[in-house]
Amino acid sequence: MISQQFPKHVENQWLALEIGNSRLHWALFMGESLKFTWDTEYLPESVIQQLGNGETNWELGTGEKGISSSTFPPLPPAPCPSGSQSLMGETPKTELSHPLPLFIASVVPKQTALWQSYPNVRVITLDQIPLNNTYPTLGIDRALALWGAGMSWGFPMLVIDAGTALTFTAADGERNLVGGAILPGVGLQFASLGQKTEQLPQVEMAEIKSLPPHFALNTAEAIQSGVIYTLIAGIRDFTEEWLSLFPDGKVAIKGGDRILLLNYLQALYPELAGRLIVEPNMIFWGMQTIVAGVA
């Protein structure tokens, strides 16, 4: 691991930003404590410049040049004084003399480049994560999630990330990367069938209220059946293989589709579902250990 000097925290607060394939994922830390998380769409360069000038949601407003509070929640620019509301409620309007330190983990280089104008930014890279046996093209999101989960619940650890892609990433008890797998996630599989074929309909996630029949009698449910049951079978296969290799190993799941897939696993394989650690913020915990210098 390469040691690196990180920017000084302003009033012990700092921002973590995971730039994903579809959205931005944010966290506000106070020291080592995670206080608040939220998601936004990708932000225009003008808004990034405003944030870099220390302007919070209160100053950004809701006009064409700003961003609404529904998209970017208020960030307290200083620790809440006695008598003020918590981070989850209203916070005092105070101007930042300096923008909060920002630590970025990104899998989208074009988006990363936009944030270089932010004056107090640091991009976390793979060589800063103390995993052994990594390879150069291992995604920073996979590595940080694995590191965060392992440091929180112990190694050996298998992390399942149910996002745009469904990924499996594992490390043994000595923090050596065992390896993993990548396949299209739930939404991407539905989208590919809907967009790349002439007659198959686009199935939306919101349309799925319960497990479809295995052998469907209409096209929409046939697509649901094919995607869902093969994904669940894949999760079961990888998890069982992992536990056969590492009987004392742990399995954690994250990602935007984690609850959907967990519900299906609970219905079909409740014992297996009961072994899963459900934690959406593994990447942020991994970032926190890197920022704090914990290894």
Curated annotation (Swiss-Prot):
Span list, region Disordered: 71-91
One Gene Ontology cellular component annotation held by this UniProt entry: cytoplasm
Binding residues annotated for substrate, in chain numbering: 135, 139-142, 219
Pathway(s): Cofactor biosynthesis; coenzyme A biosynthesis; CoA from (R)-pantothenate: step 1/5
GO molecular-function term, one example from the UniProt record: ATP binding
Subunit structure as annotated in this protein's UniProt entry: Homodimer.
Name of the protein in its database record: Type III pantothenate kinase
Highest classification ranks of the organism: Bacteria, Bacillati, Cyanobacteriota, Cyanophyceae, Nostocales
Gene that encodes it: coaX
